Amino acid sequence: MTMSSFLINSNYIEPKFPPFEEFAPHGGPGGGDGAVGGGPGYPRPQSAPHLPAPNPHAARQPPAYYAPRAREPSYPGGLYPAPAAACPYACRGASPGRPEQSPAPGAHPSPAPQPPVPLGHCAPGPTTPAVATGGSAPACPLLLADQGPAGPKGKEPVVYPWMKKIHVSAVNSSYNGGEPKRSRTAYTRQQVLELEKEFHFNRYLTRRRRIEIAHTLCLSERQVKIWFQNRRMKWKKDHKLPNTKMRSSNTASAPAGPPGKAQTHSPHHHPHPLPGASTPIPSSI
């Protein structure tokens, strides 16, 4: 009776709470209370603001770390297709428990992955827009490599010594292939005239004179020596003279003839009998 009179006479105001539906998942054994125990005497915590339920049919936006990377403009899109297994839910917009849903009307559909292209060919990938600076997108690297080393200025390609063709004689086995075949020297009319004048006076040159002629005619000492060798062979052929080298080799290789038979004479043998010498007369029987 005392308790009932206290409740009637006191200014105690009974608190009002939200409906039971909002706190049903978080309520304790006391029913609609948000605190453990659910007694009416306990102070109740402030309730969280009411959030609307998510729409299950709305398209889920993929997180930032699942977003596909933007392709760089230097590579065509056909060479590097985006892997489909990297973002299965972000690309399809569905979770394992929900069926696949059509994309939202404002979202752009992701392009379908293209099949890989062999390395030897250049696929015509999607045309990338021009760069903001005004330059066009770079072309295929394979096509740029096929244009050759000559640049836009028309420069000649660089030819290194190892790229030149070397004439190697198959007969000479001791040839190591380091020196190319010597080209034939083309003498000018002035050089030939001076060499002919020198040959008219001296068919054989000393080393000092050969060096002087080579320096005067802008030739090498070897070229002057070879020219005089060839000119001497021509002169001998014109005068029908035997080759000096062949004659010397023939005389050296010819065997010596058989020596004459030496006659041996005995000191007591006389081919003719001396006068007054008596010849032995055979005795007759």
From Swiss-Prot:
Positions of the DNA-binding region: 180-239
Keyword Zinc-finger: no
Extent of Pro residues compositional bias: 106-118
Keywords, comma-separated and alphabetical: Developmental protein, DNA-binding, Homeobox, Nucleus, Transcription, Transcription regulation
Composition-biased stretches (Gly residues): 27-41
UniProt-annotated stretches for the region Disordered: 19-70, 94-130, 238-285
One Gene Ontology cellular component: nucleoplasm
Gene Ontology molecular function terms on file: DNA binding; DNA-binding transcription factor activity, RNA polymerase II-specific
Biased composition (Low complexity): 44-70
Coiled-coil ranges per UniProt: none
Compartment(s): Nucleus
UniProt short sequence motif Antp-type hexapeptide, positions renumbered to this chain: 159-164
UniProt disease annotation: Overexpression results in abnormal gut development (megacolon).
Function: Sequence-specific transcription factor which is part of a developmental regulatory system that provides cells with specific positional identities on the anterior-posterior axis. Binds to sites in the 5'-flanking sequence of its coding region with various affinities. The consensus sequences of the high and low affinity binding sites are 5'-TAATGA[CG]-3' and 5'-CTAATTTT-3'.
UniProt similarity note: Belongs to the Antp homeobox family. Deformed subfamily.
Protein name as annotated: Homeobox protein Hox-A4
